[in-house]
Amino acid sequence: MAALLMPRRNKGMRTRLGCLSHKSDSCSDFTAILPDKPNRALKRLSTEEATRWADSFDVLLSHKYGVAAFRAFLKTEFSEENLEFWLACEEFKKTRSTAKLVTKAHRIFEEFVDVQAPREVNIDFQTREATRKNMQEPSLTCFDQAQGKVHSLMEKDSYPRFLRSKMYLDLLSQSQRRLS
């Protein structure tokens, strides 16, 4: 059964990667990077929703298509690790099992926070060391300081570039054309 599904999944991935392999200002078919079924997703995305993403970074992060669009933009800049870390922290905070909490905490630390981590986020030494210390007794708040720094970095750096990007402007244009 899985083998039968593989070609469809690969085709979708090729479409997404094809769009992402270009620079961020050359990707105008935004539907390729939205989650789920792209055409239906774009039809459900209103101009008002996409415009609201410019209201604040937190508004963007609260909308699943906003996160998908921002992730696609960050991939074009090879800097999606910050968003992936932020999302992993948000998911981590929902953990209720103590055993799972410890396992997830170590996985997040090793993936994003540790020096030379595979997807190391850009945080200062003090924040990294405070987070390392928090790992001695992981809790739901052990990544709060690092997550806050990463959020601030994305908000001040990546988010303004996203709002000016051809990718975002094309998305707005496409959603407005649907209204016409």
From Swiss-Prot:
Annotated positions of the Phosphoserine modification: S26
Give the matching CDD domains: RGS_RGS8
Subcellular location as annotated: Cell membrane; Membrane; Perikaryon; Cell projection, Dendrite
Coiled coil regions, renumbered to chain: none
One Gene Ontology molecular-function label: G-protein alpha-subunit binding
Q: What is its main location?
A: membrane
Q: Does the keyword Secreted apply?
A: no
Q: Which SMART domains match?
A: RGS
As annotated in Swiss-Prot or TrEMBL, what is the tissue specificity of this protein? Expressed at high levels in brain. Very little expression detected in other tissues. Detected in Purkinje cells in the cerebellum.
A GO-annotated cellular component: synapse
Please list the residue ranges annotated as the RGS domain.
56-171
Sorted alphabetically, the Gene Ontology BP terms of this entry are:
G protein-coupled acetylcholine receptor signaling pathway; negative regulation of signal transduction; positive regulation of GTPase activity; regulation of dopamine receptor signaling pathway; response to amphetamine
Q: Which Pfam families does this chain map to?
A: RGS (PF00615)
This protein's superkingdom?
Eukaryota
- Membrane topology per record: Peripheral membrane protein
- Alphabetical keyword list: Cell membrane, Cell projection, Membrane, Nucleus, Phosphoprotein, Signal transduction inhibitor
Write down the InterPro entries for this protein, in alphabetical order: RGS, RGS_RGS8, RGS_sf, RGS_subdom1/3, RGS_subdomain_2
Tell me the function of this protein: Regulates G protein-coupled receptor signaling cascades, including signaling via muscarinic acetylcholine receptor CHRM2 and dopamine receptor DRD2. Inhibits signal transduction by increasing the GTPase activity of G protein alpha subunits, thereby driving them into their inactive GDP-bound form. Modulates the activity of potassium channels that are activated in response to DRD2 and CHRM2 signaling.
Checking PANTHER family in the record gives:
REGULATOR OF G PROTEIN SIGNALING, REGULATOR OF G-PROTEIN SIGNALING 8
- State how it assembles: Interacts with GNAO1 and GNAI3.
Q: What is this protein called?
A: Regulator of G-protein signaling 8
Its lineage reads: Eukaryota, Metazoa, Chordata, Craniata, Vertebrata
State the gene name recorded for this protein. Rgs8
